[in-house]
């Protein structure tokens, strides 16, 4: 039986909160995260990089990284 790696839930919550704070519409960003997670799940169905990381968590991390990169570029 494989054991899931312990994700720092406070870090993921921080990322999700950062994502929500940058969004003008909480519903829209929630739908975007869900759509990205669904798309990534089907795109990488055969080629799974990290089978222990859920697609939703991966989508939150990726989207918050994109927001922080935009902030870095604009500064």
From Swiss-Prot:
Which GO BP terms apply? DNA-templated transcription
What SUPFAM superfamilies does this protein's entry cite? RPB6/omega subunit-like
Question: Listed GO cellular component terms?
Answer: DNA-directed RNA polymerase complex
The GO terms this record gives for MF are: DNA binding; DNA-directed RNA polymerase activity
Coiled-coil spans are: none
Q: Which Pfam families match?
A: RNA_pol_Rpb6
The record lists the catalysed reaction(s) as: RNA(n) + a ribonucleoside 5'-triphosphate = RNA(n+1) + diphosphate
Q: What does the record give as EC number? A: 2.7.7.6
Keyword annotations? DNA-directed RNA polymerase, Nucleotidyltransferase, Transcription, Transferase
Return the InterPro entries for the record: DNA-dir_RNA_pol_omega (IPR003716), Pol_omega/Rpo6/RPB6 (IPR006110), RPB6/omega-like_sf (IPR036161)
Statement: the UniProt record of this protein carries the keyword Ribosomal protein: no
Q: What does this protein do?
A: Promotes RNA polymerase assembly. Latches the N- and C-terminal regions of the beta' subunit thereby facilitating its interaction with the beta and alpha subunits.
Q: Which HAMAP family match?
A: RNApol_bact_RpoZ (MF_00366)
Name the family.
Answer: Belongs to the RNA polymerase subunit omega family.
Could you give the subunit structure recorded for this chain? Answer: In cyanobacteria the RNAP catalytic core is composed of 2 alpha, 1 beta, 1 beta', 1 gamma and 1 omega subunit. When a sigma factor is associated with the core the holoenzyme is formed, which can initiate transcription.
- State the name under which the record lists this protein: DNA-directed RNA polymerase subunit omega
Q: Which gene encodes it?
A: rpoZ
């Amino acid at each position: 039986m494989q054991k899931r790696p312990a994700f720092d839930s406070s870090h993921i919550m921080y990322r999700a909160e950062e994502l929500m704070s940058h969004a003008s519409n909480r519903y829209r960003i929630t739908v975007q995260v869900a759509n990205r997670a669904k798309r990534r799940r089907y795109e990488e169905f055969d080629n799974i990089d990290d089978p222990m990381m859920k697609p939703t968590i991966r989508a939150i991390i990726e989207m918050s990284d994109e927001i922080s990169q935009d902030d870095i570029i604009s500064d």
